[in-house]
Structure formats: C-alpha cells, structure tokens
C-alpha cells in the first residue's frame, strides 16, 4: 500500500482551493464532483513531487461533517492505494482497525471501489484500488 492522498474538510471548496494554491502552490487537478453517497463535494489538488490533497465540503444533509467544519474543519483522512481492497481490508481488520465502510463504488474515483477504516487515535483511513480520479482537468 502507498499513500494516494490526504484529505481535509473545508467549509467552502472555492476558498479552500484558493488557500492551498496561495499558501502551498497546489493546483486544482479535478473538477468539483458531488458525491451523493458520502454527501460531500470533492476536488483534488496536486503539486509536483508532493502528495495529492483532497478537499471535501459537506452537503447540507451531512450533519456530522457540517459540525466538524463549523468548528474549523481540517484533517479528515489519509488514503492508501492498494492492489486488493478486500485482502487489505481483512489484513488491517486483523491488526485491530475497525471497518467503517465496506468496499463500494467511489464517485470521485470513477466508481472504482473504496473502503473506510478507523484506526487508533481517531485516524480515518480510506482504501482505493485505482489511480483514476473523476473529472481530471489535466
């Protein structure tokens, strides 16, 4: 498994994108995707030779994430790309991580499977099995 991206929850994607561009030199690499399953709007940012950043903005129906961003938002999860989600999910579960979301199509990843786990210290982990991102701009 390798790190694919780190995710931050923001109150407003437009403002979040502008901040990451101004402060760290990141550029938006995907259009904004509305993820109906997770009730968020999503975009990815990149910078040469650096980790990809995913920004999420909650939709009105995502009360828990709305509460989080209303308190300032911030780090949400780290995502690992793996070859076999089912196998790695089982391995990580055997190591004590709690499965939050079983593998399901991820709208931000052109419907390739994603899964979520919870590790110690409140660390949310996403697993994906693709390099694809929906809505690529370049």
List PLM regions with ranges:
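Vicinal oxygen chelate
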Residues: 1, 3-12, 33, 43-46, 53, 65-91, 115, ...
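Long, hydrophobic N-terminal alpha-helical segment
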Residues: 1-38
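Short secondary-structure boundary micro-motifs
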Residues: 17, 27-30, 62-63, 81, ...
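Short, charged helix-to-loop "capping" segments that act as catalytic/coupling loops
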Residues: 24-28, 48, 108
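Short, well-structured hydrophobic secondary-structure segments
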Residues: 38-41, 51
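Short, conserved turn/kink motifs that form compact alpha/beta structural patches or helix kinks used as
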Residues: 57-61
């Amino acid at each position: 498994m390798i790190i694919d991206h780190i995710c931050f929850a923001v109150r407003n994607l437009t403002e979040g994108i502008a901040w990451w561009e101004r402060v760290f030199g990141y550029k938006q690499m995907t259009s904004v995707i509305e993820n109906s399953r997770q009730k968020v709007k999503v975009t990815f940012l990149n910078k040469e030779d650096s980790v990809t950043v995913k920004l999420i903005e909650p939709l009105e129906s995502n009360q828990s994430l709305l509460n989080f961003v209303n308190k300032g938002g911030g780090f949400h999860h780290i995502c690992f790309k793996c070859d076999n989600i089912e196998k790695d999910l089982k391995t990580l579960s055997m190591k004590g991580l709690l499965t939050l979301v079983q593998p399901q199509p991820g709208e931000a990843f052109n419907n390739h499977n994603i899964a979520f786990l919870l590790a110690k210290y409140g660390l949310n982990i996403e697993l994906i099995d693709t390099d694809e991102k929906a809505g690529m701009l370049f």
